[in-house]
Amino acid sequence: MIRVAYNNQFGGFSLSNEALALLSEYKGIKLDNYLASELPRHDSDLIKVVSELGNKANTSISSLAIKELSSPYYRIIEKDGREEVVEPELNGFIKID
């Protein structure tokens, strides 16, 4: 199961101080919001932090959510800070492993 973190409100993707501290602990390096925003949104530690903290991971400009993907492909589309996770329509395609 692949999961992706995204921001579900206008404002922008950002993590609370508590979430940044926990993510930094998991990663073993000091992260700020800029560095955390460079992580892939499917990063397992990021998903773990958002899952564990729930609303405590949010800031005044973010409402973080997690989407489970049906395939290993996704794109995040952002408008005014609000994000949508989009998966391609792959029905009928054959995947070579």
Residue ranges and their predicted role:
Residues 2-96:
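Catalytic phosphate/metal-binding cores of nucleic-acid and nucleotide-processing enzymes, i.e., regions
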